[in-house]
Amino acid sequence: MALKNFNPITPSLRELVQVDKTSLWKGRPLKSLTKGISKTGGRNNQGRITSWHRGGGHKKLYRIIDFKRNKIDISAIVERIEYDPNRTAFIALIKYEDGEYSYILAPQKLSVGDRVISSQDADIKIGNCLPLKFIPTGTTLHNVEMKVGKGGQIARSAGTSVDLVGKDSGYAQIKLRSGEFRLVPLDCKATIGSISNPDQKNINLGKAGRNRWLGWRPHVRGVAMNPVDHPHGGGEGKTSGGRHPVTPWGFPTKGKKTRKNKRTSKFIVKKRK
């Protein structure tokens, strides 16, 4: 996929950079693989904001993605590559030999007409899904399971992938894009290749309104608030906050480590950079 630049006939077009989607499917998604999705506005079941700066945005249908790839030893053909408003990666509609349809995350270089399969005997080919114990070291992977049968959780965002760097004592060692080395059970499944749409990181929305279409509201700085709203608020004139950066609740931010899951720390061989 290439990037699109625009002639600056309006101010918002001057900086706009978008991913060229001309090769994607232009129709509607397969109705049987979609469902409605309700907006939360960043609120939880008590009506309190738990995710700030969310709200509004264009109405969307949720595409049901097969992260588990549980249809074993049944080949499927790629019918089309589609845009998905719920994620940064593109998705592929595949049709199995028994007639069933499914959506999967589209890896780079997967084309219409290609065949994919989930099997321990599958070839090491883009889009095929295998248990890690049958994948050779050095292979680039995406949609990697962390728990057997739970479905892929690692490397699902646009352009991402992990590298299989070793196998030992029932675990595979994978290298994440963050620089982290992690252990994953060898019976967990992963898909060959890296995720589509690697140019997502180079886009420029061009104007605030386009962010609103995506469901993001304005991010107000703490120093622009009143003292009642934020520890950085208040002061005469424009002040810098007068203390080290903190959250609205007074906890250190901007680099403070927040990970607290000691139970799974034993699976992290090397921490992220």
From Swiss-Prot:
Region Disordered, annotated ranges: 228-273
User: Where on the tree of life does the source sit, at the highest rank?
Assistant: Bacteria
Basic residues bias (residue ranges): 254-273
For this protein, the record's InterPro entries field holds: NA-bd_OB-fold (IPR012340), Rib_uL2_dom2 (IPR014722), Ribosomal_uL2 (IPR002171), Ribosomal_uL2_bac/org-type (IPR005880), Ribosomal_uL2_C (IPR022669), Ribosomal_uL2_CS (IPR022671), Ribosomal_uL2_dom3 (IPR014726), Ribosomal_uL2_RNA-bd_dom (IPR022666)
Query: Which GO biological process annotations does it have?
Result: translation
Which SMART domains does the UniProt record give? Ribosomal_L2, Ribosomal_L2_C
* Gene Ontology terms for molecular function: rRNA binding; structural constituent of ribosome; transferase activity
Keywords assigned: Ribonucleoprotein, Ribosomal protein, RNA-binding, rRNA-binding
- Note whether rRNA-binding occurs among the keywords: yes
Q: Mind telling me which Pfam families this protein's record contains? A: Ribosomal_L2, Ribosomal_L2_C
Membrane-crossing residue ranges in chain numbering? none
* Gene Ontology CC: one annotated term: large ribosomal subunit
Q: Which SUPFAM superfamilies match?
A: Nucleic acid-binding proteins, Translation proteins SH3-like domain
Q: Matching NCBIfam families, A to Z?
A: rplB_bact (TIGR01171)
Q: How does it assemble?
A: Part of the 50S ribosomal subunit. Forms a bridge to the 30S subunit in the 70S ribosome.
Which family is annotated? Belongs to the universal ribosomal protein uL2 family.
Query: What's the stated role of this polypeptide?
Result: One of the primary rRNA binding proteins. Required for association of the 30S and 50S subunits to form the 70S ribosome, for tRNA binding and peptide bond formation. It has been suggested to have peptidyltransferase activity; this is somewhat controversial. Makes several contacts with the 16S rRNA in the 70S ribosome.
Q: What is this protein called?
A: Large ribosomal subunit protein uL2
Name the species this protein comes from. Answer: Rickettsia felis (strain ATCC VR-1525 / URRWXCal2) (Rickettsia azadi)
